[in-house]
C-alpha cells in the first residue's frame, strides 16, 4: 500500500504545518500563568500531537482535492499525487487515519472543546476553503483564512478547556493576528504566481482585480496588522519585551508593504512573502519569551 514514506511526509506539507503547530504551542504556553502543572503538561503534549495530526490530514486532503489544479502550477507540479508517486485512494486512507488518530487523542485524552474546534478548523480549510472558497471568490484567502488562523486557540483550549470568557478573549487576539496576517502573506505570493493562478482559473486577487489593486490591499492589511499587534500589550496579555519586538517586526513589514506599491523588481513580492513567514514565527516567539522565559532570566 505504502510507497516511500517520504511521499506521505510531503503530503502533510511539513513546513506549513510546522508554523501552524508552533503558533498552537505558543497558545498553550500563553494560556498557563507561571509553571504548568503535570496535568497541563500532559494535555499540552497530547493536544500538540492531536493538532499536528489534524493539520497534516488537512494538508493531505487539500492536495487530494486540488491535484488537478496543482498539476497546472509550477509551484505545486512536483507534489506526490500529481507526479503519480501515490494514488488518490492512498491519500484518502492516509488522511482518514490521521483524522481518526487526532480525534481519538483529543476526545479521550485532552478535552472535547479542543476536538470540536480542531475538527471545525480541518473542515474549514480542507473542505470549505479548498472545495468552495478558493474557486468562488477573490476574497478566498480573507474568508478562508479563519480556519488557518485557529491553531493558537486550539492550543489554548487544549490546556484550559476554555473555561472562562478570558480564555476566549485572549486566544481570539492571537487568532486575529494570524487572520489579518494571512491576506498580505498569500497575496504577495499570488502576485508572483498570478499567471499560474490564472492558468488554473483560481480567482486570486491579482488575477481578478490586478496587481496594482492587490498591492494597495497588502498595504491596508499591513497597517491593520501593525495596529492589531499592539492589542496583546494594551490588554495586559504581554509586556514591553513583546511590544518592542512587535514594533520592529511591523516596521519592517510595513516597509515591505510600502515598497510593494512600487517594487524594484518582479521578485520583490517573493521577498515579502518569505519575510512574512519569518515575521509570524518571530512575533509568536516574542510572545513566548515575554510570557514565560523572560521572567525566569
Curated annotation (Swiss-Prot):
Q: What's its catalytic activity?
A: heme b + (2E,6E)-farnesyl diphosphate + H2O = Fe(II)-heme o + diphosphate
Primary subcellular site in the record, as a coarse category = membrane
Q: In which pathway does it act?
A: Porphyrin-containing compound metabolism; heme O biosynthesis; heme O from protoheme: step 1/1
First-level EC class: transferase
- GO terms for molecular function, please? protoheme IX farnesyltransferase activity
One GO term under biological process is: heme O biosynthetic process
Misc. remarks from the entry: Carbon 2 of the heme B porphyrin ring is defined according to the Fischer nomenclature.
Recorded protein name is: Protoheme IX farnesyltransferase
State the species of origin: Stenotrophomonas maltophilia (strain R551-3)
State which gene encodes it: cyoE
Amino acid at each position: 500500500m505504502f510507497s516511500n514514506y517520504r511521499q506521505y511526509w510531503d503530503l502533510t506539507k511539513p513546513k506549513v504545518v510546522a508554523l501552524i503547530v508552533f503558533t498552537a504551542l505558543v497558545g498553550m504556553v500563553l494560556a498557563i500563568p507561571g509553571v504548568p502543572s503535570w496535568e497541563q503538561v500532559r494535555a499540552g503534549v497530547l493536544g500538540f500531537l492531536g493538532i499536528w495530526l489534524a493539520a497534516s490530514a488537512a494538508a493531505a486532503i487539500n492536495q487530494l482535492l486540488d491535484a488537478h489544479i496543482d498539476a497546472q502550477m509550477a509551484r505545486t507540479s512536483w507534489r506526490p499525487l500529481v507526479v503519480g508517486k501515490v494514488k488518490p485512494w492512498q491519500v484518502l486512507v492516509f488522511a482518514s487515519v490521521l483524522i481518526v488518530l487526532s480525534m481519538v487523542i483529543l476526545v479521550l485524552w485532552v478535552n472535547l472543546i479542543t476536538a470540536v474546534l480542531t475538527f471545525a478548523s480541518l473542515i474549514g480549510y480542507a473542505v470549505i476553503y479548498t472545495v468552495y472558497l478558493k474557486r468562488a471568490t477573490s476574497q478566498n484567502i480573507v474568508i478562508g483564512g479563519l480556519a488557518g488562523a485557529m491553531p493558537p486557540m486550539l492550543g489554548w483550549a487544549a490546556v484550559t478547556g476554555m473555561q472562562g470568557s478570558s480564555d476566549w478573549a485572549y486566544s481570539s487576539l492571537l487568532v486575529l493576528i494570524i487572520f489579518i496576517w494571512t491576506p498580505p502573506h498569500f497575496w504577495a505570493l499570488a502576485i508572483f504566481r498570478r499567471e499560474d493562478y490564472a492558468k488554473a482559473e483560481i480567482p486570486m486577487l491579482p488575477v481578478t482585480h490586478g496587481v496594482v489593486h492587490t498591492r494597495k490591499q497588502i498595504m491596508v492589511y499591513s497597517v491593520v496588522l501593525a495596529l492589531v499587534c499592539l492589542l496583546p500589550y494594551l490588554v495586559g496579555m504581554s509586556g514591553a519585551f513583546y511590544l518592542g519586538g512587535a514594533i520592529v517586526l511591523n516596521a519592517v513589514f510595513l516597509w515591505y508593504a510600502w515598497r510593494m506599491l512600487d517594487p524594484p523588481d518582479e521578485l520583490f513580492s517573493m521577498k515579502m512573502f518569505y519575510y512574512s513567514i519569518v515575521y509570524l514565527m518571530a512575533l509568536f516567539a516574542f510572545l513566548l519569551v515575554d510570557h514565560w522565559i523572560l521572567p525566569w532570566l
